[in-house]
A protein has these predicted regions:
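Acidic, low-complexity central loop/insert segments
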Residues: 81-107, 126
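Mid-sequence acidic-hydrophobic segments that form the walls
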Residues: 45, 56, 60, 92-99, ...
Length: 262
């Protein structure tokens, strides 16, 4: 899918393309990094529960489990919270033949269980002391970057021992487009043997909330000297009446099937 605006996500880069150059009507468009915004347009128009399987495209992705193009399953369930959606994903895995045991842990639980860090009540100075003690670079401006760094070094290696682990209620600083309640965002990720497979939210609903989150992301991209482009004003206009209360998830198909086959 070609979009008029790129992703605002701080850590996901869009691929831009020039179209109609031979017609002397050249314009810049962007390959979608997920079908999220297109699907939320449909949700705002009353589509109800909705799913899509499609190819998505991301720049600056390379490695054993990363690719510039991959297949994504994305779906939204009206009136679901993240716990209902996580349960449905477990049912989906069972339908695909998985009988592996599943574990659910909150972000705070997983940090305390595997590292004895009180992640939700630790400020940026506390976390910088921990990263320094581990010999890691602590030169970060935002606390969420240090939270993610510690997660990668202290938590992800432990998750390799768990066939399927769902981690929910992330710190509010990592909310992305998830609803925030108190110190946590109603967001979850699913890991299979330590590899992230799915990312889901209890979705924010109003156009104003999306505008605020997008602007926050664009400001961070600018601070990191990344292309920060502009807001998708067409999307915000389409969401004038908001979307219904729902939860949604994106699942990487290639990663999922490669791990189901183990």
């Amino acid at each position: 899918s070609l979009l008029e605006a790129p992703s605002t996500d701080v850590y996901i880069d869009s691929i831009e393309v020039l179209v109609n150059q031979a017609l002397a009507k050249s314009s810049k468009l962007y390959l979608h990094t997920s079908p999220e915004l297109e699907m939320k347009r449909l949700l705002s128009k009353g589509s109800g529960d909705i799913f899509q399987i499609c190819q998505v495209f991301r720049d600056n992705e390379h490695g054993r489990i990363n690719s510039n193009e991959f297949t994504m399953l994305e779906f939204y369930r009206i009136k679901f919270n993240i716990h209902q959606l996580m349960d449905e994903i477990i049912e989906l895995l069972a339908a695909l033949g998985s009988s592996a045991p599943t574990k659910k842990l909150s972000y705070a639980q997983v940090f305390f269980e595997y590292s004895e860090i009180d992640i939700l009540n630790s400020d940026i100075h506390d976390l910088k002391e921990i990263t320094n003690s581990l010999g890691l670079n602590s030169d970060y401006e935002w606390i969420e970057d240090i939270q993610m760094l510690l997660f990668v070094h202290l938590i992800e290696p432990k998750l390799k021992e768990i066939p399927i682990c769902l981690i929910y209620d992330f710190p509010k600083q990592q909310a992305a487009l998830a609803e925030i309640h108190g110190p946590t965002a109603h967001r979850f990720e699913m890991y299979m043997n330590g590899t992230e497979i799915a990312n889901g939210y209890q979705e924010i609903q109003s156009a104003n909330d999306y505008r605020d989150r997008f602007n926050t992301e664009l400001n961070k991209r600018k601070a990191l000297s990344k292309p920060f482009e502009f807001l998708d004003h067409g999307f915000l206009k389409d969401l004038e009446k908001g979307i219904p209360k729902c939860s949604g998830v994106a699942i990487g198909i290639e990663r999922l099937y490669s791990l189901l086959s183990l």
